[in-house]
C-alpha cells in the first residue's frame, strides 16, 4: 500500500488529521522536498509530531530509482510518501503513482493545502481566471528559458492570469520574486513583445505562515521590493475584474494611477 500525503504549505502542523493518522499507522515513511518544502519546520519537527522516522529522498531516488526504495517497500508494507503542498500537483508524483499501479500496488491520496488555492485566497484573484502555469528556472549554462514568457503572452491574449512557480535548486537555493522578475525582463529586452515590461505583477512569500507577504505593483517596482525569506511565488495578471482590482488594493498594496 502506498499513500501519498500532502503536508500543506508552511510547517508540520499543516497536515490533516487523516494524514497524521496514516503516518502513524505506516510501516515506512518517505518524503521528498525538492519540488516544495515546509519552510517553517525542520525534519526533526516533523518526526517529533508524527512519531515516526522520515526517510528523505533525493530527485534521482524518486524519478529514476523508485523501485529501490518506495515501490519495493510498498509491495508488502504500509508506506507513506510525504510532499509539500498537495501530493499530486507535481507531475513526478503522478508518475510515481502510475508506476505503483503497474506493479499492482494499491495507492491512496490524502490531499493537503495547495499553493494554487492559497494564492487566490491571499490576493483575491479569481481562481477560474488562471490559465496555464509555468516555472521560472535558474539559467542553465547562461541560457534563460523563454517558456514562462511565452506562457504569459498566451494567457494575456486569452484574458487569463499566469501563476509562476520559482525554481528550487540544491546548489543555487530558492529563487526569489526579484530574481524571477530579472529573468523575465531579460527575455523581454530580447523579445520586445510587451508581455511583461511595465506590466502588473504580484509577488507572494511564505504563504501559509503567520506572516505572509503579498505585494502588487508594476513589475519594475517589485524588482526592488524586499519580500523576505522563502518560499516565493509570482502572478502575472491579465486585465483585472473590478473585484480583483479592489482586492489587490486592499490586500496587496496596489496603487493605481
Curated annotation (Swiss-Prot):
Matches recorded under CDD domains: DHP5_DphB
Catalysed reaction, written as an equation: 2-[(3S)-amino-3-carboxypropyl]-L-histidyl-[translation elongation factor 2] + 3 S-adenosyl-L-methionine = diphthine-[translation elongation factor 2] + 3 S-adenosyl-L-homocysteine + 3 H(+)
EC category name: transferase
GO terms (BP aspect): methylation; protein histidyl modification to diphthamide
GO terms for MF: diphthine synthase activity
Source organism, top-level taxon: Archaea
Keywords assigned by UniProt, alphabetized: Methyltransferase, S-adenosyl-L-methionine, Transferase
Keyword Cell cycle: no
Pfam families reported in the protein's UniProt record: TP_methylase (PF00590)
Binding-site residues, S-adenosyl-L-methionine: 9, 86, 89, 114-115, 166, 207, 232
InterPro entries: 4pyrrol_Mease (IPR000878), 4pyrrol_Methylase_sf (IPR035996), 4pyrrole_Mease_sub1 (IPR014777), 4pyrrole_Mease_sub2 (IPR014776), Dphthn_synthase (IPR004551)
EC number(s) recorded for this UniProt protein: 2.1.1.98
Pathway the protein acts in: Protein modification; peptidyl-diphthamide biosynthesis
NCBIfam families: dph5
Self-association and partners: Homodimer.
Function: S-adenosyl-L-methionine-dependent methyltransferase that catalyzes the trimethylation of the amino group of the modified target histidine residue in translation elongation factor 2 (EF-2), to form an intermediate called diphthine. The three successive methylation reactions represent the second step of diphthamide biosynthesis.
Family: Belongs to the diphthine synthase family.
Official protein name in the record: Diphthine synthase
Amino acid at each position: 500500500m502506498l499513500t501519498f500525503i500532502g503536508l500543506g504549505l508552511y510547517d508540520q502542523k499543516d497536515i490533516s488529521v487523516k494524514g497524521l493518522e496514516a503516518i502513524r499507522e505506516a510501516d515506512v515513511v518517505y518524503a521528498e522536498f525538492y519540488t516544495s518544502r515546509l519552510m517553517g519546520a525542520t525534519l526533526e519537527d516533523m518526526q517529533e509530531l508524527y512519531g515516526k522516522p522520515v526517510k528523505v529522498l533525493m530527485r534521482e531516488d524518486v524519478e529514476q530509482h523508485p523501485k529501490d526504495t518506495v515501490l519495493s517497500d510498498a509491495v508488502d508494507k504500509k508506506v507513506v510518501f510525504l510532499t509539500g503542498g498537495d501530493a499530486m500537483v507535481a507531475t513526478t508524483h503522478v508518475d510515481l503513482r502510475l508506476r505503483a499501479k503497474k506493479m499492482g500496488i494499491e495507492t491512496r491520496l490524502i490531499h493537503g493545502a495547495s499553493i494554487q488555492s492559497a494564492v487566490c485566497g491571499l490576493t483575491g484573484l479569481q481562481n477560474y481566471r488562471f490559465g496555464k502555469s509555468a516555472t521560472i528556472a535558474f539559467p542553465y549554462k547562461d541560457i534563460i528559458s523563454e517558456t514562462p514568457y511565452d506562457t504569459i503572452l498566451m494567457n494575456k491574449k486569452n484574458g487569463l492570469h499566469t501563476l509562476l512557480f520559482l525554481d528550487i535548486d540544491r546548489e543555487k537555493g530558492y529563487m526569489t520574486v526579484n530574481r524571477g522578475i530579472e529573468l523575465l525582463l531579460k527575455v523581454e529586452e530580447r523579445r520586445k513583445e510587451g508581455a511583461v515590461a511595465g506590466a502588473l505583477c504580484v509577488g507572494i512569500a511564505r504563504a501559509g505562515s503567520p506572516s505572509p507577504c503579498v505585494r502588487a505593483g508594476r513589475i519594475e517596482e517589485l524588482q526592488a521590493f524586499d519580500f523576505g525569506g522563502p518560499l516565493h511565488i509570482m502572478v502575472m495578471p491579465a486585465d483585472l475584474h473590478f473585484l480583483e482590482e479592489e482586492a489587490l488594493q486592499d490586500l496587496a498594496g496596489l496603487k493605481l494611477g
